[in-house]
Amino acid sequence: MRTKSLKKNKINVITLGCSKNVYDSEVLMGQLKASGKNVVHEEEGNIVVINTCGFIDNAKAESVNTILEYADKKERGLVDKVFVTGCLSERYRPDLEKEIPNVDQYFGTTELPALLKALGADYRHELLGERLTTTPKNYAYLKISEGCDRPCSFCAIPLMRGKNVSQTIEKLVKEAEGLAKNGVKELILIAQDLTYYGLDLYKKRALGELLEALVKIEGIEWIRLHYAFPTGFPMDVLEIMKREPKICNYIDIPLQHISDSILKSMKRGTTREKTTKLLKDFRAAVPGMAIRTTLIVGYPGETEEDFEILKEFVQEMKFDRMGCFAYSHEENTGAYELVDDVPDEVKQARSLEIMDLQSQISWDLNQEKLGQTFRCIIDRKEGGHFVGRTEFDSPDVDNEVLIDATKHYVKTGEFVNIKIIEATEFDLYGEPA
């Protein structure tokens, strides 16, 4: 099929996976727009770019299925060109080129200039950070570094994203100022490891210095921290969080496990005792802080005793938010040399058991919020409700606050004080205070 003239080309960028991919797609779309390209919503484009995830089996399957779907559409003349980028392409490019050759070209995670060239656009270094945001207008992700230097045995991210590379404080402040001018009120700081930020550039952990600079930006009212690592956490961050009202009393710190034998095999560089002390220090330094974590069950060699230790820890710590995943045996990782000896059905059962525990904890914690009033940001209107969040909740993964739109009006993108009148495990219901 003949490709349409450049003026008529419409480029559809499909994003799969995590918030880092969302950010990368926004950068790509910003560059395309700056080159005069027509970036459109899904199903409207005749040129498709798929930004893939290659982290675990389920994510890889979703990415492969999406590539197959659009390769088939190209075969049937429904789209003209298909390009693939992101982590799956970085990790498995030779295999993908062999198995799905109908894709026009595959690109890795560091090949933005080449991808833009293939799309007929110019790469403009001075525009880095100027994105076409896809999130609601009131919040945006700010990726402060790329890659990871940690040796975690189960994780394939360093294979796909490389070593840690921090962005300068000056660049990040400039990017955040641009977002604020466009109406962004909440910055969600993301990285593979926030706590490592600055070690490559400044030879020290500089997350605290970055936060001190970001809180000065006019228009930014919330700054949220995602993906901290429990080893080497810069404790000055807690002092800043307590002092600065713009820093949300919230942290996402994936712990993965707590049994010492599993932590050692995972090469996490910590112990149950050290982790427990760290979390207690968090709560002592910032009373009321919401702690989100992620756990992995079914790691090679995980015994019933290890799992019981993990359950006890969950019950003891009463995390505010949690996700739990069944271990995925990833090639070219350290753990791939181990025997994947926990049956899939046991992995799934353990994951469900952990989440059942967390559901009860979440229910209890949310019941305590009844009658309280919280400052909420209103993200959107959906169905019969306005949907917002407290400072203790991140988009997509945490609690939402639902306000009955048939009884009350609140403005999306704005902060509103909401009194909680009803609560379930994962949602709060409220009315303007």
Swiss-Prot record:
Main location, first listed in the record: cytoplasm
Alphabetic keyword roster: 4Fe-4S, Cytoplasm, Iron, Iron-sulfur, Metal-binding, S-adenosyl-L-methionine, Transferase
E.C. designation(s): 2.8.4.4
Domain Radical SAM core, chain residue ranges per copy: 134-364
InterPro entries in the record: Elp3/MiaA/NifB-like_rSAM (IPR006638), Methylthiotransferase (IPR005839), Methylthiotransferase_CS (IPR020612), Methylthiotransferase_N (IPR013848), Methylthiotransferase_N_sf (IPR038135), NA-bd_OB-fold (IPR012340), Ribosomal_uS12_MeSTrfase_RimO (IPR005840), rSAM (IPR007197)
GO cellular component: cytosol
Compartments, as annotated in UniProt: Cytoplasm
Domain (TRAM) ranges: 367-433
One Gene Ontology MF term: 4 iron, 4 sulfur cluster binding
Names of required cofactors: [4Fe-4S] cluster
Record-listed [4Fe-4S] cluster 1 binding positions: 18, 53, 87
Entry superkingdom: Bacteria
Biological process annotations from GO: tRNA modification
Ranges for domain MTTase N-terminal: 9-124
CDD domains with a match to the protein in the record: Radical_SAM (cd01335)
CC cofactor note: Binds 2 [4Fe-4S] clusters. One cluster is coordinated with 3 cysteines and an exchangeable S-adenosyl-L-methionine.
SMART domains: Elp3 (SM00729)
Transmembrane spans: none
Enzyme class of the recorded protein, top EC level: transferase
Reactions catalysed: L-aspartate(89)-[ribosomal protein uS12]-hydrogen + (sulfur carrier)-SH + AH2 + 2 S-adenosyl-L-methionine = 3-methylsulfanyl-L-aspartate(89)-[ribosomal protein uS12]-hydrogen + (sulfur carrier)-H + 5'-deoxyadenosine + L-methionine + A + S-adenosyl-L-homocysteine + 2 H(+)
Role this protein plays: Catalyzes the methylthiolation of an aspartic acid residue of ribosomal protein uS12.
HAMAP family on file: MTTase_RimO (MF_01865)
Protein name (record): Ribosomal protein uS12 methylthiotransferase RimO
